[in-house]
Regions:
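Transmembrane beta-strands of outer-membrane beta-barrel pores
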Residues: 10-14, 33-39, 67, 78-84, ...
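Solvent-exposed loop/turn segments connecting transmembrane beta-strands
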Residues: 5-21, 36, 175
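Cleavable N-terminal export/targeting peptides
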Residues: 1, 173-174, 189
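A C-terminal functional module that forms or caps the active site or interfaces directly
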Residues: 121, 130-131, 135-137, 148-150
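A membrane-pore/channel beta-structure motif
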Residues: 1-3, 22, 29, 36-37, ...
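Extracellular/periplasm-exposed beta-strand and loop segments of Gram-negative cell-envelope proteins
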Residues: 33-60, 82-118, 144-180
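Outer-envelope beta-barrel architecture signal
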Residues: 2-4, 15, 25-27, 70-72, ...
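Residues on the lipid-exposed face of transmembrane beta-strands in outer-membrane beta-barrel proteins
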Residues: 8, 17-21, 61-65, 76-78, ...
Length: 189
């Protein structure tokens, strides 16, 4: 049996670098870092326009069980999130926040994983196509919801902000897990 494998790939959390250690014919341990995926965009929530910056990533540590010592595997472990989503709004005209109208001010918000370290489950397949080389794919979930927070500059009542955040949190609570889809290439040595 060949030992360690190193791999590169892409996932819903960004570009991936992984290291795999096969413990036996049917069991292996896998660690990976995913990151580098970011985007900036605008979104409107209620009357408030936000500039949003999103950066995805984190570290995963998984135990793999290869079904019938085949390419199919079930994986379970943890994902430590390094994901950051920030939102900023600069109010320059009459804008309703909560129950009041504001004409000036700044709102800073963020969305993070509810769990910094969350359970992770996936099913995957490794296809060996040449001596030491394989292609793999995973489909799974990181079991963590998302939590929103916000603060405002002087003059914006936190009670009004809390009402806005409650609306955002209601939408986020509909997401009990973060989808995880990955594809990669490994080399065993």
């Amino acid at each position: 049996m060949q030992n360690w494998a190193v791999g590169l790939g892409a996932s819903t959390m960004g570009a991936e670098l992984e290291l795999v250690y096969p413990y036996s014919q049917s069991m292996s341990f896998r660690g990976f870092y995913a990151g580098g995926l970011s985007q900036d965009f605008n979104e409107t929530q209620g009357d408030v326009d936000y500039d949003i910056k999103e950066k995805l990533g984190g570290f995963g540590a998984l135990f793999n069980y290869h079904l019938f010592a085949s390419g199919w595997r079930f994986s379970g472990g943890v994902f430590a999130s390094d994901t950051s989503i920030t939102a900023t709004s600069t109010i320059t005209s009459a804008t309703t926040i909560g129950d009041n109208d504001y004409v000036t001010g700044t709102i800073d918000g963020s969305v993070k994983f509810k769990r910094k370290v969350a359970p992770m489950l996936s099913v995957g397949y490794d296809w060996q196509f040449a001596n030491g080389w394989s292609v793999n794919a995973d489909l799974g979930a990181i079991v963590s919801g998302l939590k929103a927070t916000a603060s405002g500059s002087e003059g914006i009542d936190q009670v009004d902000l809390n009402k806005e955040i409650a609306d955002v949190q209601d939408e986020l609570d509909k997401i009990p897990a973060i989808p995880y889809i990955a594809f990669g290439v490994n080399y065993r040595f």
